[in-house]
Amino acid sequence: MTVKFSQVSYVYQKGTPFEHVALRDIETTFQQGKYYAVIGQTGSGKSTLIQHFNGLLKPSTGKLQIDDITITHKTKDKVLKQIRKRIGVVFQFPESQLFEDSVEREILFGPKNFNMPIDEVKARAYKLLIDFGFSRDILQQSPFQMSGGQMRKIAITSILAMDPDIVILDEPTAGLDPKSRDQIMKMIKKLQVEQNKTIILVTHEMNDVAKYVDEIKIMKQGQLVEECSPRKLFSDTNYVNQLHLDVPDVVKLQRDIEDKYQYYFNKIALTEDEFIDMYKEWQEDER
């Protein structure tokens, strides 16, 4: 499932004194099976961009092409329903949107609205919940008796159980403990690798971007200013600082060691394991 933005702009409250241009002439493509990060400062247009994928917002000008479906400002809601089954969006703090009295009812609410095969949905949901570390009787429990991290996993499961081709996550690990954060990020990566899902991650957490992402799309003041790999972006720490973004911890460590020993590695490490291998190789060469 390929999504192409063609000269997409979006204006909030158009024609009023409060008019605000949130997106300006976005031209980009999201390919099936890749893991993307959409990054930028607060107010750069990230959340507005992702709301166009399933028609929560429609372009003020320009168009989206999602496989054979074209979305413009004139597109009818009945057309959008076709793509909403295939694109799952997990918004910030999704646990705040839970309302059913059992995990099973919560997970099945969306699929029932789309007339999906319930047995298949339950089977997928059950496997996801077990992978997240829940007990086998989880489906009959109330989500409101669980911790914040557990509720977040339930909310994410309710989207993933619908088996979307594209999974969009807006700050999915915000406010979570390290264990829950790690579980969620590993699960999402597993979906990409094993099921060829397209993943679109909106985040300020650059450690996750470095570790999991294939391609970065950088937003600034409603414009897409660059598309690049994590290694290319984080190799230029001055540029990262200019964007007012954090440098991943492993990159900070590498730069500190390079400055201390005046030895410069031939590439930037994106994970701890990668840096350990580079460091060991350097130490062996020094002997």
Swiss-Prot record:
Membrane topology according to the record: Peripheral membrane protein
Top-tier EC class: translocase
Keyword vocabulary terms for this entry: ATP-binding, Cell membrane, Membrane, Nucleotide-binding, Translocase, Transport
GO CC annotation: ATP-binding cassette (ABC) transporter complex
Record: residues binding ATP: 40-47
GO MF: ATP binding; ATP hydrolysis activity; ATPase-coupled transmembrane transporter activity
Primary location recorded for the protein, binned into one broad class: membrane
InterPro entries the UniProt entry points to: AAA+_ATPase, ABC_transporter-like_ATP-bd, ABC_transpr_CbiO/EcfA_su, ECF_ABC_transporter_ATP-bd, EcfA2, P-loop_NTPase
Cell compartments where the protein resides: Cell membrane
EC number(s) reported in the record: 7.-.-.-
Pfam families on file: ABC_tran
Cross-referenced SMART domains: AAA
Disulfide bond annotation, renumbered to this chain: none
Complexes and interactors: Forms a stable energy-coupling factor (ECF) transporter complex composed of 2 membrane-embedded substrate-binding proteins (S component), 2 ATP-binding proteins (A component) and 2 transmembrane proteins (T component).
Purpose of the protein: ATP-binding (A) component of a common energy-coupling factor (ECF) ABC-transporter complex. Unlike classic ABC transporters this ECF transporter provides the energy necessary to transport a number of different substrates.
Family recorded in the similarity comment: Belongs to the ABC transporter superfamily. Energy-coupling factor EcfA family.
Name of the protein this chain belongs to: Energy-coupling factor transporter ATP-binding protein EcfA2
